[in-house]
Every structure is written in structure tokens, then in C-alpha cells.
């Protein structure tokens, strides 16, 4: 049986998403399987992640699926895209989005000026390996590092302050998905700091290297603040654009663009 599903495609600085309203989906659908099929760039629509959202009384919930069908706990670029979509459809400028157990406050100042308060971060969680173990990993692969730091912003990140070649980032990103250090994998951020700007590329667990990562930008900014590498406000630079970061009362606030690409219909054969 073939089912027709309405979708929207958007991107945040090149990090692209297929977004579907849950009301358009049958309750019998395996959402992980659907997301994996939609995300395939050869046989589906193609995206880094698939977003399923639902409207509640005074907030929206969203579920994030990676290209391999696994779920993600947070995605800053996707939240900006969803906030813009809701703004375009309803005119709402102040929007609350719940991801997992975390409520995030979004404000759409203009179509391409969207801020998200992602709350505070943690540098001390049970999933984080000891500093000695992380540095032994770096020594094994002969990484020339300035510093490394684990950050939890609702999802797990390792920030590596170092200048590495693209092929090395791929190798390190893949190696760190093994269970040796991070039982559930980790998002690996490769950060270079210059003139209070963070030049960032991110290996996202379940997705690989992406053109941008909003939660990675927030985590890297928080790490840079803690280590004294940057001050607030700061800019995180990606290949397709920048995010403006600031800290207010312990909360990390991200501001940037979200771009509408298309609306369409996807034919899902169960």
C-alpha cells in the first residue's frame, strides 16, 4: 500500500531537514523506518535528519531522527527551522519547543533572525569519560591539541580544539563512536578559535560530518567560555554561514537563519 505524506524541506546553514507534522501520519507507521527512507539522498527526499513535530496546547513537541533511523536528543538548527515554519504558518513569534524533556524558548525576530534559548550546559555527567582516557585516545592518534572538553547540552558533545585535515576529522569522528570511551557514541566538534570566533566542523553521531550543527555550536561556545578562549557574545563560523552566540544568566542563546526550501508530497510504500 502506498501512502502520501506531506513534508517541508528546510536547512539551517546547509544542515538540512525533512519536517513532517505528526497529524499527517498514520499511527501504524514505524517512524524510525519512515525517517530512514525519507532521509536517503538516493531513494528518498534526502536530508541530514528527519523531524516529526506535533502541536500541543501552548507548545510544540519534536522528535529527531538521524539518517540511520536512530533518534537524536537535540538539534539546534532543526529547532530554528521548525520555529520559522511555525512562524510562516501561524504568525507566532514566541514559540516553545519541547525536545525530550527539555523545553526551548524560540523567538522569531524576522524570517532569518531566529533565536533559541537552549538553557544551561553541564560539564559533569556520568557518560563523560575521565580526562586521562580522552587524552590517551588523543596520544594514540598523535593529535596535536590545544584542549578537549566534554559538554552535555541535552545531547553529548566532545569539543576538540585543534586544526585537523578533513580526512582526519572523519577518522577521529568514526573512531569515537566505538564503545571504548562513549557507550552511546558522541557528537565530535572540531573547533579553531581566532579573534573571538569559533571555526567549527562537527561529526554528528548517526549522521557523520554535516555542514553545520546548532547544538555543536552551543556546546563549543560553552566550552570556549569555560576555558577562556572566547567571551560573550561570540560568532561560530560554518561553511554556509554563522551563528551568533551569547550567554545570559548561565543560559546559552543561539541566533541565526533558517531557510525554507520546498513543500512536497512523499509516497511511502509500507
From Swiss-Prot:
Site positions for Could be important to modulate the pK values of the two catalytic cysteine residues: 157, 204
Protein family (similarity comment): Belongs to the diaminopimelate epimerase family.
SUPFAM superfamilies: Diaminopimelate epimerase-like (SSF54506)
Residues binding substrate: 15, 49, 66, 76-77, 155, 187, 204-205, 214-215
UniProt entry tagged with the keyword Amino-acid biosynthesis: yes
Any one Gene Ontology BP term: lysine biosynthetic process via diaminopimelate
GO MF, one annotated term: diaminopimelate epimerase activity
The UniProt record lists the keyword Electron transport: no
Subcellular location: Cytoplasm
Pathway in which this enzyme or protein is active: Amino-acid biosynthesis; L-lysine biosynthesis via DAP pathway; DL-2,6-diaminopimelate from LL-2,6-diaminopimelate: step 1/1
Function: Catalyzes the stereoinversion of LL-2,6-diaminopimelate (L,L-DAP) to meso-diaminopimelate (meso-DAP), a precursor of L-lysine and an essential component of the bacterial peptidoglycan.
Entry keyword set: Amino-acid biosynthesis, Cytoplasm, Isomerase, Lysine biosynthesis
Official protein name in the record: Diaminopimelate epimerase
Enzyme class: isomerase
EC id: 5.1.1.7
Reactions catalysed according to its record: (2S,6S)-2,6-diaminopimelate = meso-2,6-diaminopimelate
Entry's Gene Ontology cellular component terms: cytosol
Gene designation: dapF
Oligomer and partners: Homodimer.
Active site per UniProt: 75, 213
